[in-house]
Amino acid sequence: MRVMWSAALMVAFGAGAADLTVMSTGAVKAAFTDASTQWSKESGNKVTATFDPAGPLRQKIASGMRGDIVIIPVDSFAALEKDGIIVPGSRRDLGAVSMGAAVKEGAPLPDISSVEALKGTLRNAKSVSYMDPERGSSGKYFDTVILPKLGMREEVRAKAKLGEGGSTAEKVASGEAEIAFQNVTELMNVKGARVVGLLPAELQSPIVYAGAVMKGAKHPAEAQRLLDYLASSQGRKVFLDRGFTAP
């Protein structure tokens, strides 16, 4: 597979280097950066990406902002296709991610191994951080699905420290919150924070992220090559190494 990709990328490089622009949600930032950097080295093309929570990203798209590629949760794709924003057939599923929890580095690790244990941890926590439900997919899921299932929505909301962007683990690292919840890929590698683990399986509904070429892309062929690379065995390995599971 590596030989095949190298040959394809040499063809792309021969056609002249492109500068691709990518509009993406933050959940894929680490994995995408690693994989696209490797692709850039092999192809000679440049990739410039911006990362936002899903809500603000949708707002940018609605306002008319465009790039060569958009990466967003798959539940947004029906609307993107209906509105003629993405190129039909260009979508590539990149990976799925589950919800996890993090605490300040050095703090005791709370028990989140079962639904009852998680309820106890939430009840005992003085402050809880998760993404603003209006801005991030993980925050919306935590607020509208997980907390109601636990019967603790109002109780947790009363002591919530909502994240506006980036990683909610930054709030536990700074001491603003005692425990943080988000897609595990966004909790990883935050200085001063430690990932506790994943939430119980019965509370999970992994979010699948996918990319597609946007209509009006300046470099549609190169954009599709990048997406194909991300979905290949080489690209998939990078996503798996960064906490994703296969879509």
Task: Give the label of every model feature segment.
Residues 68:
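Periplasmic binding protein-like
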Residues 1-8:
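Sec-dependent signal peptide recognition
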Residues 8-17:
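Hydrophobic h-region of N-terminal signal peptides that target proteins for export
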Residues 17-55, 59-63, 71-84, 90-97, ...:
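Exported/periplasmic ABC-transporter solute-binding proteins
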